[in-house]
Design a protein with these regions (language model features):
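Fe-S ferredoxin-like electron-transfer domains
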Residues: 1-126, 135, 140-170
Length: 170
């Protein structure tokens, strides 16, 4: 359906809420999201959305993939078990920092964010160690070594700018 002036669009219905819950449950089941042991527990957008939607358990079988944790960077860690592939890190690194260190690799369940053509993050020649990627991560996938997300003051002022840039490029 093409967008028209005066069009009425429903963004909140029982059917849409059901779909939102299902998508969120699939995100939880796809990777190893165990909130009680996560560095982002209590400060995670995925967890907050699940609470808002009233999700108390997942109706899909968990996959429990063996995803790697890259702690090779001197300041930061990426835990692929917690990544939801939102690509905020990719976009902030490219559009705000201008480094384009992050990218996506693989398809489907094998997809993951990578640095410099799948080099360990600590060996990246393009990473400026600015930490912008860590600050925009909605889960505990990117975090500072030795700190929980609760200890970090997340600076997310980049998010409205990313939306604006995307709209200008379209």
């Amino acid at each position: 359906t093409a967008v028209e002036e005066g069009m009425e669009v429903t963004t909140d219905s029982d059917r849409l809420q059901k779909y939102r819950k299902m998508i969120l449950e699939l995100l939880f089941a796809e990777r190893n999201h165990i909130c009680s042991v996560c560095v982002s527990n209590g400060h995670c957008e995925l967890q907050m959305l699940a609470q808002t939607l009233g999700i108390t358990h997942v109706h899909f079988p968990y996959r429990y993939p063996k995803m790697e944790v890259d702690a090779s960077h001197e300041r930061f860690v990426i835990d692929h078990n917690r990544c939801i592939l939102c690509t905020r890190c990719v976009r902030v690194c490219d559009e705000i920092e201008g480094a384009h260190t992050w990218d996506l690799m693989g398809r489907g369940i094998d997809a993951k964010v990578i640095t410099d053509l799948n080099e360990p993050w600590g060996l990246s020649e393009t990473c400026t160690s600015c930490g912008k990627c860590v600050h925009v991560c909605p889960t505990g996938a990117l975090f500072e070594k030795g700190r929980s997300v609760a200890e970090m003051l997340k600076r997310r002022q980049f998010l409205p700018y990313l939306t604006l840039m995307r709209e200008e490029n379209e």
